[in-house]
Regions:
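N-terminal glycine-rich flavin-associated loop
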Residues: 99-119, 148
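Amphipathic, small/basic residue-rich leader segments at the start of a protein or domain
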Residues: 1-103, 119-134
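Buried hydrophobic packing segments
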Residues: 85, 89, 108-112, 156
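Glycine-rich, Trp-frequent "lid" loop and neighboring beta-strands that shape
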Residues: 75, 115-178
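Short, solvent-exposed polar/charged micro-motifs at secondary-structure junctions
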Residues: 39-41, 76-77, 109-110, 146-149
Length: 178
């Protein structure tokens, strides 16, 4: 059965309503804001519009919908219930950020939630879930086709109580993108 759960249907309705009221009407304003930041020589500055919409989305319970089965994100959904929400959010390239559902943060938060120590979760996962920081996933390496995240040469090994990461990364841009 690929039907949405009652909760999934309700969140889809609420998300569609939020997008219609707050995101879709602001596409031109976001484009103007982005163009202004670029013209001012600061393309990576945080967007005041997105910050405002994030506060509204959080207040309406439309925050961290992607993370299933986590005590830190009880709003989380199954992949089946989350998929139609992604489709709706995907209509505007920047809207997943409004709901704290943007890559690479979503994948990095999932990894931290599943495998991170309590210390790592407190230091990195909690601020990511709160939307206070952003993360990066740098998979570019000089000797492999790095658009495939399973095709990495970088290696990690245990050395006593520590881990040693050994590898080279290629230039990456956008790491400063809030």
């Amino acid at each position: 059965d690929l039907s949405l759960s009652p909760r999934g249907r309700e969140l889809e309705r609420r998300l569609r309503d939020f997008l219609q009221r707050r995101v879709w009407p602001n596409e031109a304003a976001h484009a103007d804001e982005t163009a202004g930041a670029r013209a001012a020589g600061d393309p990576w500055q945080p967007s005041p519009l997105i910050a405002q919409l994030q506060a509204e989305a959080r207040a309406e319970g439309l925050w961290n919908l992607f993370l299933p089965d986590s005590p830190r994100a009880p709003e989380g959904l199954s992949n089946l219930d989350y998929a139609p929400l992604c489709e709706l959010m995907g209509r505007v390239y920047w809207s997943p950020e409004v709901f704290n559902c943007a890559a690479p943060d979503t994948g990095n938060m999932e990894v931290l939630a599943r495998y991170g120590s309590q210390e790592q979760q407190a230091r990195w996962l909690d601020p990511l879930l709160d939307g206070r920081i952003r993360s990066a996933f740098l998979m570019t390496e000089p000797d492999v086709a790095s658009s495939d995240a399973t095709n990495l040469q970088c290696a990690i090994r245990r050395d006593g109580d520590d881990y040693v990461i050994d590898g080279r990364k290629w230039y990456a841009s956008g790491a400063g993108d809030p």
